[in-house]
């Protein structure tokens, strides 16, 4: 039982399921940046190094937000506010993960890749968690930069450069992020209100939030389609799949305006995760065939 609790607690701290989506956004860059497929070793080190850096950022986030987490029903049982893991212990593990990640990526990949990963951590911890999240409804719009760095890491790992295609994929995720997290904020509105986080549904109301979700969904969909025209290796497979899933995502966001209920927001939230996974997988598959 103690062993099960130990692994469960650290699993909550490092959030591997969330990190898996970040890792998925790295893979297109690994394949698009070179005509030759990347080595298994390079893929493994890049993904594992990023996993460590992402895990460290989530640990630091929960150390900083421990008092607010204690006020939220969804997060009150996390290991730090419930005191199953101490602040010094979590901080030490976070620093160790961050240091090991930077070392691995610098030595076995390149310095640019390590700096991209470290920039993501710094922006998530300092820009988003400390500065923006407690202060503005636009916290996730600006602070979401941290979650967009995956494509930069992928391209940097292979080519030691950041070409325009990397920034296009960065922009796609940047436009995906607000709609995704505002949908989450709708069905967790009371929790965020209890913790005094100025999330958009709390401050502006759900109706305004659903309109903003629709707006960003359209921008995100347009960016997905534009990648077909800006990346020469993309073929009809990518275009067809993108059109289908973007149309459906647009329909879901419009339905959310008409029916701004928690269940509809949750449905959009879950589909947005599937959408981003599918887009990144499709990019790789289309490039390889």
Curated annotation (Swiss-Prot):
Compartments (UniProt record): Cell inner membrane
UniProt feature coiled coil, ranges: none
Annotated Pfam families: UbiA (PF01040)
EC class: transferase
Transmembrane spans: 13-33, 40-60, 85-105, 111-131, 139-159, 168-188, 212-232, 234-254, 269-289
EC number: 2.5.1.141
Catalyzed reactions per annotation: heme b + (2E,6E)-farnesyl diphosphate + H2O = Fe(II)-heme o + diphosphate
GO cellular component: plasma membrane
An example Gene Ontology molecular-function term: protoheme IX farnesyltransferase activity
Record Gene3D superfamilies: UbiA prenyltransferase
Keywords: Cell inner membrane, Cell membrane, Heme biosynthesis, Membrane, Transferase, Transmembrane, Transmembrane helix
UniProt main location, coarse: membrane
GO biological process, alphabetically ordered: heme O biosynthetic process
InterPro entries assigned to the protein according to its UniProt record, in alphabetical order: Protohaem_IX_farnesylTrfase (IPR006369), UbiA_prenyltransferase (IPR000537), UbiA_sf (IPR044878)
Membrane topology: Multi-pass membrane protein
Pathway the protein acts in: Porphyrin-containing compound metabolism; heme O biosynthesis; heme O from protoheme: step 1/1
Protein family membership: Belongs to the UbiA prenyltransferase family. Protoheme IX farnesyltransferase subfamily.
Alphabetical list of HAMAP family matching this protein: CyoE_CtaB (MF_00154)
Protein purpose: Converts heme B (protoheme IX) to heme O by substitution of the vinyl group on carbon 2 of heme B porphyrin ring with a hydroxyethyl farnesyl side group.
Protein name: Protoheme IX farnesyltransferase
Gene source species: Leptospira borgpetersenii serovar Hardjo-bovis (strain JB197)
Gene: ctaB
């Amino acid at each position: 039982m103690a062993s099960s609790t130990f692994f469960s607690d650290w699993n909550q701290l490092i959030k591997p399921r969330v990190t898996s989506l970040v890792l998925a956004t790295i893979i297109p860059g690994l394949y698009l940046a070179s005509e030759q497929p990347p080595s298994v070793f390079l893929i493994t080190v890049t993904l594992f190094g990023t996993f460590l850096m992402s895990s460290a950022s989530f640990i630091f986030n929960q150390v900083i937000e421990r008092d607010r987490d204690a006020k939220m029903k969804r997060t009150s049982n996390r290991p730090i506010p419930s005191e199953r893991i101490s602040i010094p212990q979590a901080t030490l593990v976070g620093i160790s993960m961050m240091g090991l990640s930077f070392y691995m990526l610098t030595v076995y990949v390149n310095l640019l890749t390590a700096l991209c990963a470290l920039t993501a951590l710094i922006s998530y911890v300092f820009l988003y968690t400390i500065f923006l999240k407690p202060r503005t409804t636009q916290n996730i719009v600006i602070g979401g930069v941290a979650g967009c760095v995956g494509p930069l890491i992928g391209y940097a790992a292979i080519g030691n450069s950041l070409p325009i295609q990397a920034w296009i994929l960065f922009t796609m995720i940047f436009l995906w992020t607000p709609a995704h997290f505002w949908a989450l904020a709708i069905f967790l509105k009371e929790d965020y209100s209890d913790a005094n986080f100025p999330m958009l549904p709390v401050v502006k109301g759900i109706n305004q939030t659903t309109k903003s979700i629709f707006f960003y969904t359209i921008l995100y969909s347009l960016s997905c389609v534009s990648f077909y025209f800006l990346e020469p290796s993309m073929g009809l497979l990518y275009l067809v799949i993108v059109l289908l899933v973007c149309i459906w995502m647009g329909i879901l966001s419009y339905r959310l305006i008409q029916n701004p209920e928690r269940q509809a927001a949750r449905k959009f939230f879950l589909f947005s995760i599937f959408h981003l996974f599918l887009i990144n997988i499709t990019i790789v598959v289309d490039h390889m065939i």
